[in-house]
Amino acid sequence: MIEREKLDKVKHRFQEVESLMADPEVANDPDRMRELGQEHSRLEEVVEAIDRYERLLDERDELEGMIRDESGEMEALAKEELEQLETKLPAVEEDLKQKLIPKDPEEEKNAIVEIRAGAGGDEASLFAGDLFRLYTQYAKQQGWTYELIDASPGTQGGFREVIFAVKGEDVYGTLKYEAGVHRVQRVPETESSGRIHTSAATVAVLPEAEEVDVDINPSDLTIETFKATGPGGQSVNTTDSAVRIKHAPSGVEVSCQDEKSQHKNRSKAMRVLRSRVYEKKREEQQAEREEARRSMVGSGDRSAKIRTYNFPQDRVTDHRLEGGQKNHSLQPIMDGEIDPIIDALRAEEHAEKLANL
C-alpha cells in the first residue's frame, strides 16, 4: 500500500502549482509559466490516479465495516463487493505507482554508445567486439537502427574503441543500464596452456543531444584534420579526411575517421561532441544533487564493475541484482537477449524512486 502522506504531498504540490499559475507576477514570466504548465499537466494526471486509488480504499474501509456490523444478506452482499474491489485494487495501485515516478525526458532520446577495451590487451579488444555485436543484435531485436560513428580496430580483431549511435523508441532509457565496467573470464584462443584470463571493457551510454539541448559556440571549437589510420597505425587514406574537434570550455575532444568524406566525419564528430558536452553538464548537476543527498542519507554507490561474463561456467552475473535475477545463461546474453536484466534493473530503479518520493 502507498503511504497516504506521500499522496498528500503530491496533492499539496498540485494546489501550490495552481496557485502560482494564478499569480499575476508569475503570469508575466513566460519561461516560469511554461515550466509550471508542464508540471501542472503531469501532476493533474497523477492527482486523478490518486483520486481513483483513494476512492477504492475508502470503499474498501466501508465494506469491511459493513461486514463487521451487518449479517445475513447485507453481509454476503458486502463480501461479494469487497471481493470484486480487491481484484481491481492492485492494477489501480500499480498504475498510480508508475505515474508517481517522474518521467525523465532524457529516456526518450536516442543514444550514443561508446565501448572501450580496458585491461587485458588483445583479449579486451576482442571482448569489446563481442559487446558491440551484443548491442547491435539487441538493437535489431528492439526494432531500432544503429549507425557506426567511429572505430579503432584491435590488432587481433575486435576494437580498442568503437562509438555508435542507436535510434528508436526509449533507446537511452533502456541502454543506460549498460553503462559501466564489463568483465570477461575466458581462455583466449591464443592461450595454449588453457589458462583463464580476466579482461574488461567499459561501456558509456549518453543521451544523444539535439542542437537545442546544448549551446555550443563555434568560436570555442578547435578543428583539426589528419589522415585516417588503420590497426597498427598505418595510414589508410591519402587525404586529410579524419577530423578532431576540441571544445575549449569543457575540454571535451572527439575524433572521427570512419567515413572517407571529411564533411561526414566532421558531422559525426559534432554529434558525439554535443552529446558528451551535454552529458558533462548533466553529470555536474547530478553530482551536486547527489552530494546534497549523500550528506543527508550516506552513500549507496555500487561498484563500477556491473557484470561478469564467465565463459568456462557458461554464466553471466550482473552484480547489481540479487537472488534469481543475478545469474543468467551466457549464450542468450551474448546474442543480445538482455531484456531480463534490463527489466529487473528498471523495476529496482522504479522501486527506489518510489521509496525516495
Curated annotation (Swiss-Prot):
Residues 276-294 have a biased composition (Basic and acidic residues). GO terms for molecular function: translation release factor activity, codon specific. One of its GO terms (cellular component) is cytoplasm. Methylated by PrmC. Methylation increases the termination efficiency of RF1. Transmembrane segments: none annotated. Residues 249-308 are annotated as: Disordered. Keywords: Cytoplasm, Methylation, Protein biosynthesis. It is found in: Cytoplasm. Residues 263-274 have a biased composition (Basic residues). The keyword NADP does not apply. Its main location: cytoplasm. InterPro entries: PCRF, Pep_chain_release_fac_I, Pep_chain_release_fac_I_sf, Prokaryotic/Mito_RF, RF-1. The modification N5-methylglutamine is found at residue 234. Belongs to the prokaryotic/mitochondrial release factor family. Peptide chain release factor 1 directs the termination of translation in response to the peptide chain termination codons UAG and UAA. This is Peptide chain release factor 1. It comes from Salinibacter ruber (strain DSM 13855 / M31).
